[in-house]
Structure formats: C-alpha cells, structure tokens
Amino acid sequence: MAQRDTGGGQQRTGRRDDETAEAEVEESGASDLKERHEKLSEDVDSLLDEIDDVLEENAEEFVKGYVQKGGQ
C-alpha cells in the first residue's frame, strides 16, 4: 500500500511559528498596556493633586457650597 505524505511536519513548524508570533504580540501588548497604565496613573495622580490644592485654598467655600446644595 502506498503511504500519503500529509505534510504534518510543515504544519507543526507552522504552529510553532504561530505560537511564537502570538507570544510576541502578547508581550508587546503587555508592554503597551503597562505603559498606558503608568500614563493613566500619572494623569490621575496629577488630577488628584490639583483637587487637593484647590481644596486647601478654598476649603471653607467648598464646605459652604456643599452644605448649600443639600450635602450633610
């Protein structure tokens, strides 16, 4: 009986290449995500610092405005 070559060896190599490519994409995606997270964290920290500065300067006005609007 004749045996057929299904090219299985090439498919295995293709899978390894695909896995390597996927790993590279995941690594670059993870580094992009990390950079984005750091940038957003810096932005949030900056905004919170700005809010703190405003509250320190205008704390009394802030409290009066809050109470007048129905805050407790």
Curated annotation (Swiss-Prot):
InterPro entries: Ubiquitin-like_Pup. Residues 32-41 have a biased composition (Basic and acidic residues). Residues 22-61 form a coiled coil. Residues 1-11 have a biased composition (Gly residues). There is a cross-link at residue 72 (Isoglutamyl lysine isopeptide (Gln-Lys) (interchain with K-? in acceptor proteins)). Residues 28-66 are annotated as: ARC ATPase binding. The modification Deamidated glutamine is found at residue 72. The keyword Coiled coil applies. Is modified by deamidation of its C-terminal glutamine to glutamate by the deamidase Dop, a prerequisite to the subsequent pupylation process. Residues 19-29 have a biased composition (Acidic residues). One of its GO terms (biological process) is protein pupylation. GO terms for molecular function: proteasome binding; protein tag activity. Pathway: Protein degradation; proteasomal Pup-dependent pathway. Residues 1-41 are annotated as: Disordered. Keywords: Coiled coil, Isopeptide bond, Ubl conjugation pathway. The N-terminal unstructured half of Pup provides a signal required to initiate unfolding and degradation by the proteasome but is not needed for pupylation, while the C-terminal helical half of Pup interacts with ARC to target proteins to the proteasome. Protein modifier that is covalently attached to lysine residues of substrate proteins, thereby targeting them for proteasomal degradation. The tagging system is termed pupylation. Strongly interacts with the proteasome-associated ATPase ARC through a hydrophobic interface; the interacting region of Pup lies in its C-terminal half. There is one Pup binding site per ARC hexamer ring. Belongs to the prokaryotic ubiquitin-like protein family. This is Prokaryotic ubiquitin-like protein Pup. It comes from Parafrankia sp. (strain EAN1pec). The lineage of its organism: Bacteria, Bacillati, Actinomycetota, Actinomycetes, Frankiales. The gene is pup.
